[in-house]
Amino acid sequence: MTRRAICFDLDGTLVDSLPDIIGGFRSAIAEQGLPVPGADEVRPWIGRPLLDMFAALAPEGDAEVLSAAYKRIYPQRFTQHTRPFDETVHVLEELRSRGYLLAVTTTKHSPMARDLVTALGLADLLDHVQGTDGFPAKPAPDVIERALSALDAEGTWMVGDTTHDVHAGAAAGLRTYAVCRPEATHDRATLASAHPDRLEESLLPLLDLV
């Protein structure tokens, strides 16, 4: 029997982590004495590689130095406000009960992603946590392909909250499910422009599709 897997982005999809990510990003910039962008300026960049984010939002600084500062600051606060979304545990438990393998496919590096899902009590509900470790980030499909290879499974859906997730899922040959929450990284119009197979306001409707 073919093993079936569903891939999930982490931040903004399974967990409400944007305040801690934005706070860490702004703190890293402030620490270097640079002009600090507002939260609304940072939000659309979440899910992109750190070097790209810092180059765009703190062009006066050294992106390598700022990235190193973020990697030091963020783990100290990454569960200060971060919590799973209300439906996350229920949806993951239900999908596992239906025989699906569940993977996180995130732009975070794998060790940080594993630390976060463990701290939030989600590790036992996930079969694999795949970060972006030295290969092209989403919208490239590499992180999804590596997760599916590790699971030796056929991918069915890619679930995420950004256009990068949608494009990566489509490039990997998966159906795509975009989540547009009130404080989403990308707004509904932006997500719709990527043409996901489904565009919903939470994870719950996914249960009617599998």
Stretch-by-stretch model annotation:
Residues A28-I29, R48-G61, L116, A147-A150:
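Helix-loop "lid/cap" segments that line or gate small-molecule binding pockets
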Residues Q76-V104, S110-R114, P141:
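Short, acidic loop-to-helix structural element flanking the phosphoryl-transfer center
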Residues R198-S202:
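Short acidic-hydrophobic, aromatic-tinged amphipathic segments that line or gate anion-handling sites
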Residues M1-P44, A56:
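Active-site neighborhood of HAD-like aspartate-dependent phosphohydrolases
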